[in-house]
Amino acid sequence: MFLGTYEPRLDDKARLILPAKFRAELAEGLVLTRGQERCLYVFSAEEFARVHEQMRSAPLSSKQARDYIRVFLSGASDEVPDKQGRITIPASLRSYAGLDRELAVIGAGSRAEIWDAAAWQQYLQEKEAAFSETEEEVIPGLF
């Protein structure tokens, strides 16, 4: 499970050093892809296979499902961390997420997310205020 917030930097070769706590789960390989709110999703290969299976069950007659799957999968990149726990983030994904050198890597349960640090701070500032007011119905049965 991915938890916490980390603030790494991209190096000059567009490589990210994965947080140490994430490396074991991602050591055998991972998939980077476009996420909502202009971040990148980071899935273990195993979790990505589950996500892909869910997508395969979507009706091909749904234009919205086809569009989502095309955008999601066409931007996906499979990576294997090097011995130092580094991965290269492709230029197209860096551009999509507006990544500069300063990043925020957050744990989001079954996945990690990579954000531009300033974008993450702005998102958190906007959403954190309403967090304590969130209705139970958002995630039924959680509390």
Curated annotation (Swiss-Prot):
What does the entry give for GO biological process? negative regulation of DNA-templated transcription initiation
Where it sits in the cell: the answer is: Cytoplasm, Nucleoid
Q: Provide this UniProt record's keywords sorted from A to Z.
A: Cytoplasm, DNA-binding, Repeat, Transcription, Transcription regulation
Q: Does this entry carry the keyword Hydrolase?
A: no
Q: Does the keyword Transcription regulation apply?
A: yes
Q: Which InterPro entries match?
A: MraZ, MraZ_C, MraZ_dom, MraZ_N, MraZ_sf, SpoVT-AbrB_dom, SpoVT-AbrB_sf
One Pfam family in the UniProt entry: MraZ
GO terms for MF: DNA-binding transcription factor activity; transcription cis-regulatory region binding
Specify the SpoVT-AbrB domain's residue ranges: 5-47, 76-119
PANTHER family per record: TRANSCRIPTIONAL REGULATOR MRAZ (PTHR34701:SF1)
| Binding partners and assembly | Forms oligomers.
NCBIfam families recorded for this chain? division/cell wall cluster transcriptional repressor MraZ
Instruction: Please report which protein family the annotation says this sequence is part of.
Output: Belongs to the MraZ family.
Record protein name field? Transcriptional regulator MraZ
The record lists the organism as: Kocuria rhizophila (strain ATCC 9341 / DSM 348 / NBRC 103217 / DC2201)
Gene, per the UniProt record: mraZ
